[in-house]
Amino acid sequence: MNIRCARVDDLMSMQNANLMCLPENYQMKYYFYHALSWPQLSYIAEDHKGNVVGYVLAKMEEDPGEEPHGHITSLAVKRSYRRLGLANKMMDQTARAMVETYNAKYVSLHVRVSNRAALNLYKNTLKFEIVDTEPKYYADGEDAYAMRRDLAKWAEERNIEPADREAYTTAKTTDDKKKNRS
């Protein structure tokens, strides 16, 4: 197995993996948008023949006035390749790139409240926390958990150097700002 940064020529295989694994599907232009806007953030897992068996599609949220943070748009691993640590490795590579390239303080994602396997991965392996429940988030009306993983602490524990060390360490986190307003 090999984990590497996704390239434009991987996008069809990523979309195929998405169609096989998930009920939420995207048009090809959405994959291109991610690949061209944030080329460092999406990763694939490939088997020994070079076939894509999993991917993470990620982006940076660019809300003015908010601290830099990433978002996982989609994560999928084909069924026969699950429980091998591929999702964990791809998510860690994406998190590293978010910190090293964009000074991301945290990463967010949404997950179906019924997706127990994904919740277990996010909460227990990747240390995401549920921060909110968004009613009827999905097209079929199912609710989503909004989840978040602190990247500042994660990066510090792994000696990962942010894009701009001074800005990274002097910027207050959203939680610090909320505490100061209280």
UniProtKB/Swiss-Prot annotation:
Segments carrying the region annotation (Disordered) are: 162-182
One of the record's GO cellular component terms: NatA complex
Question: Which enzyme class?
Answer: transferase
What is the reported tissue distribution? Expressed in head and tail hypodermal cells, hypodermal seam cells, pharynx, intestine and head and tail neurons.
Q: What PROSITE patterns does UniProt report for this protein, alphabetically?
A: GNAT
The record's catalysed reaction(s) read: N-terminal glycyl-[protein] + acetyl-CoA = N-terminal N(alpha)-acetylglycyl-[protein] + CoA + H(+); N-terminal L-alanyl-[protein] + acetyl-CoA = N-terminal N(alpha)-acetyl-L-alanyl-[protein] + CoA + H(+); N-terminal L-seryl-[protein] + acetyl-CoA = N-terminal N(alpha)-acetyl-L-seryl-[protein] + CoA + H(+); N-terminal L-valyl-[protein] + acetyl-CoA = N-terminal N(alpha)-acetyl-L-valyl-[protein] + CoA + H(+)
Q: Which GO terms describe its biological process?
A: dauer exit; dauer larval development; determination of adult lifespan; multicellular organismal reproductive process; nematode larval development
Report the EC code(s) recorded for this entry.
2.3.1.255
Q: What is this protein called?
A: N-alpha-acetyltransferase daf-31
Arranged from A to Z, the UniProt key words for this protein are:
Acyltransferase, Transferase
Say which species the protein is native to. Caenorhabditis elegans
Matching entries from CDD domains are given as: NAT_SF
Q: How does it assemble?
A: Component of the N-terminal acetyltransferase A (NatA) complex.
What InterPro entries does this protein's entry cite?
Answer: Acyl_CoA_acyltransferase, Ard1-like, GNAT_dom
Domain N-acetyltransferase, which positions? 1-152
Q: Name one GO molecular function term.
A: protein N-terminal-serine acetyltransferase activity
Q: What does this protein do?
A: Catalytic subunit of the N-terminal acetyltransferase A (NatA) complex which displays alpha (N-terminal) acetyltransferase activity. Plays a role in regulating larval development, metabolism and longevity. Functions downstream or alongside daf-3, daf-12 and daf-16 in the dauer formation pathway. Functions upstream of daf-15 to enable animal development.
Outcome of gene disruption: The majority of animals die within five days following dauer-like arrest, but surviving animals grow to the L4 larval developmental stage or adulthood. Animals display a dauer-like phenotype in response to pheromone and starvation, form dauer alae and have a constricted pharynx. Unlike dauer defective animals, these animals are not temperature sensitive and do not complete dauer morphogenesis. Animals have an increased propensity to accumulate fat. RNAi-mediated knock-down also induces a dauer-like phenotype and fat accumulation. However, knock-down does not influence the lifespan of animals.
Q: Which family does it belong to?
A: Belongs to the acetyltransferase family. ARD1 subfamily.
